[in-house]
Amino acid sequence: MPHGDLPLPPSYRPHEVKKAVEEFWRRNRIFEKWKSWRGGPKFTFLEGPPTTNGMPHVGHIRGRTYKDVVIRFYRLLGYDVWVQGGWDMQGMPVEWEVEKKLKLRSKKDIEQFGLEKFALECNSLVEEYLAYWREWGTKRLGLWLDLENAYETRQPHYLQYAWRIVKRAHELGLLTEDYRVLWFCPRCETSLSDHEVALGYDEREDPSIYVKFRVEGGVDEYLVIWTTTPWTIVDNEAVAVHPDYVYAKVEVEVGGRREYWWLAEALVPSLMAKFGIKTWRVVETKKGVELAGVRYIHPLAEEVPERASRPHQVVTAEFVTLEQGTGLVHIAPGHGPEDFELAKKYGLPVTNSVEINGIYNELGGRYKGKHVYDVDKEVTRDLRSKGLLVFEEKIRHEYPHCWRCGSKLILRADRQWFIAISRIRDKMYAELQKVNVVPTKLRDRFDIFVQNARDWNISRSRVWGTPLPVWRCKKDGRILVIGSLEELKKLAKELPPVDDFKLVHRPWIDQVKISAHDCDEWVREPYVMDVWLDSGIAWIAAVDGENNRDLWEKLFPYDFVTEGIDQTRGWFYSLLATSVLYTGRAPYKNVLIQGLILDKHGQKMSKSKGNVIWAKDLFEKYGADPVRLYILSKVAPWEDLSFDPDEVKYVIGDLNILWNVVKFADTYMSLDGFDAEKYPLSQWLEKGLEEDKWILSELNIMISEFTNFVKNFEFHKAAALWREFVVETLSHRYIRLLRRRVWSEEPSPDKYAAYAVLHDVLKKVLILGSILVPFITEYLWQAYVRKYEKNAPESVHLAQYPAAGSYDKELIYAYRELFAVFSALAEARNKAGIKLRWPIREAYVNGAKYAERYTELLKYLGNVKEVKVGRRPDYLCVKEGELEVCVPDKIEPELYYEALARELIRRIQVMRKETGLEISDEIHVVVETNSDDIKKAVEQYRDYIARETRAVKLIIDAVSQGKEWDISGEKVKIEIRKAQA
């Protein structure tokens, strides 16, 4: 692109800017030049791979904007950046979308559809959405990631590292198969890990029932328990009490009958009130330990006869509390981790009458073939009919749901595969303490989760995922753990006729026949692995670290990762766990935790609510830069962001101001033949005015603060600071001061000094802004910077980060005071009804420290003939803090004609712009009016009007084709024509 070849239209047009810039980047291979290593220090970024199972939305765009800001920042600082992209392309999220697409409702439906076809459908789906993510989640955002070399979790060379991790765990004795109580999704028919469960908590309404268990041998004597899962009573095996709590035998009257209920003594009054029982008394008390051994009759003995065949009794447990319920806890060892451990302690049977799909098996007696959630209601109904239901209500509480399909989870005992995280969590915690987690207020959440980490259930009863690399000898039950595809091929006596991609996926891997280690038939455990293990190995698998050791050692540990707050229990956690297991080290140095993104009403976004904002819609309407700057400016990255699309227009307004400032510079520099290399700042600054030194001081402070904000991930402060500098400091202040100098046709040294200063300021503003808004800054760099500085870097993104120079504090204070005084003066004029364009005789300034220093500037800014220090009580006065400004409450008659002349000038300038005249074009002006005042203003200020509007001819006459205006209640018609050369 020739220097300065891009045009500068009258206003900022995001879509046209994006199109031109993308073409420039493509044609000149700017990204390739940008990402190439030049021997500098390294800054390595690890991409948290988005799952390509749907369209990117504004939540994704928020996080990816933060990533881009940090990467671009360090590249400008001179670092060699590592920006490999990544895609998460397996697991339950993908399967769930395919099931919806194919209208499959269960695992049985998948099997009938065919595992091969289903796996291929999953692969096709992620391919389809990958195209959207490359375009709308990356390119249109301006996010510079290396997508040509992006890692994909589905690829053989990548997922083999999950096998390596499992094999290493096996070698360290950390891989175990165990029978435990776990959370299951009955819809997806698979177990879930603790961190997956933590991702899906949501508030819901559930039954809350109080039930009587009849004491064996007692006369109308009962143990009263409480539960929110009535279906688990089917598998009840005991009732637990705290050994040290006092329990009361309470005599109550129910339906005309006298009964005796055992409850925690401390809870009796509140429970009686809840149950609506007015007549009651405590007849006996015992400590929990004394109740141990008391036998009771299973409340569903008739419905589930198998339970009636063995005794049930009271046991003691330290985990019993008085916070909820009755102080007596119903124990179902197959449906609760604490219940399960208690069963092991007392030798209780672990009954599990519920299958993985939530359906009762033959152990469920009369409930066989029914779903737990249907049985919930049925059990309550049966207990009521038997007179065992004491009280029922609904309760709202946080309960785990499937993090992908949203189904309510169930606890059930099953045999699964685990990595014993409990044995390395102390090391994980120690390594985490070496990591800079931002913000500090959220690192506690991460710390606590790691400190309490439980063994990682890695097996999933699904199809599209990384196969669990564990084979079992059919003859003797020994296990074989395979750590690579090469090892698998070496041990295989028969392989299916497929490529490597299919070979490492179900169902093809299950067709591999292995004969080794004195076993003729090894059968693979029928699981895929937790999808969080897939993304959790990115720290090494992304670059095939074992086969590219030199590269990996330059990258690891990665300098920066960032994702949402839920990833403290998701990706951040799985990265830490796998890395510590494999290397003994944390895989990252800096973790930025992002807040949630909400709709404008503060509600969570969801498809069901219809309030999701899609990236495609946003970018098509507003363009990327306005969306980026809005996201960056609104709140701190770690705070929840309520996204209001209507607010993006304010950002567009600020970017348009930047555009206008650059256009202002281009207009006058072009007229005067400015060349930044001919008029270098170092040589011309001393020829300038004090205001030039002031703006450079403000710039240097801004650069220093901006840099620190970005380094500390305070993007909201950096973006706000940059916007304020552009809009207020540069446009509203410096440019306002500059206009009187550049409008002059005399080629004075201070004018070229002003150009040199303005060019330096704009250049540095664009470089800083390039990390925030990469498209508009590139466009202005090409259209303006390279036009006036031929040897400027080819792209703003290839420029060098500006150093923060020295600054004059006193000068800054003086000018900030000047503009505070000007603000007060403008407010006083407004209250007096005197426009800023209208001159006033004098203004009084009181309480200003530097008033004498900037008197001339205040006269120019405030359109005041004379500025005096002091106060004038008979004038209209406005106070701002310690400052006070007083002005006349009406315009003096002798200044009225000058005011009218200024009004005429404004109208003529508007008409020049409307007719598309260049700033250098000279014009003829005809004014038609019946107003003697207007005529007098033209005659008296003819030279002034002509000079300000570049009019070579100004007459009062009839107008044939003009525009009618109202000036102070007088009708005026004005016609302008370009003067012929």
Curated annotation (Swiss-Prot):
Which keywords accompany this UniProt record? Aminoacyl-tRNA synthetase, ATP-binding, Cytoplasm, Ligase, Metal-binding, Nucleotide-binding, Protein biosynthesis, Zinc
One Pfam annotation, family name? Anticodon_1
Q: Where is this motif: 'KMSKS' region?
A: 604-608
Q: Which InterPro entries match?
A: aa-tRNA-synth_I_CS, aa-tRNA-synth_Ia, Anticodon_Ile_ABEc, Ile-tRNA-ligase, Ile-tRNA-ligase_type2, M/V/L/I-tRNA-synth_anticd-bd, Rossmann-like_a/b/a_fold, tRNAsynth_Ia_anticodon-bd
The record's subunit annotation is:
Monomer.
Similarity comment: family membership: Belongs to the class-I aminoacyl-tRNA synthetase family. IleS type 2 subfamily.
**UniProt-recorded name of the protein:** Isoleucine--tRNA ligase
Native species: Pyrobaculum aerophilum (strain ATCC 51768 / DSM 7523 / JCM 9630 / CIP 104966 / NBRC 100827 / IM2)
Its lineage reads: Archaea, Thermoproteota, Thermoprotei, Thermoproteales, Thermoproteaceae
